[in-house]
Amino acid sequence: TPIDREFYDFYRTARGNSPDTSTQPPLSSNVRFMNFYPFEDIETISPRPMLFITGDQAHSREFSDQAYQLAAEPKQLVTIPGAGHVDLYDRVDLIPFDMLAAFFQNSLNPQG
């Protein structure tokens, strides 16, 4: 599938592979993962500033869109043209560093 190909191209090549990591989680993680619902706690984070970043080609984009809808203000959703799910891990040409710096500066120091 395209999703398998995207993850393979990152995690199984020099781009994202490391001899110190494994994509095989311990079996004890499976139950925790299956019981994890990330949207459940959004209201405990809001109204703190929330920033959601997704790629317009990301298979996971719908999750960012849904989380953004559930979050209270202040919130910001940034969609990066041409980016897939893993592209923002290492494709620094796509990472909006100026926008990230502005968000954190405004959010962590609202007085300027």
Each language-model region and where it sits:
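Accessory cap/linker subdomain of secreted extracellular hydrolases
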Residues: T1-P25, S29-N30, F39
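Structural motif corresponding to alpha-helix initiation and N-cap regions
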Residues: N35-F39, R61
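Well-formed, non-transmembrane alpha-helical positions, independent of function
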Residues: D41-T44, Q66
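Short beta-strand/loop motif that positions the catalytic acidic residue
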Residues: I45-S46, L51-T54
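Acidic beta-to-alpha connecting loop that harbors the catalytic carboxylate
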Residues: G55-A58, G82-G84
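Conserved loop-alpha-helix segment in the C-terminal half of the alpha/beta-hydrolase fold
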Residues: Q57-K75
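Conserved beta-strand scaffold positions in the cores of enzyme catalytic domains, especially
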Residues: L77-T79
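Catalytic active-site module of serine/aspartate enzymes centered on a nucleophile-bearing elbow/loop
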Residues: P81-G112
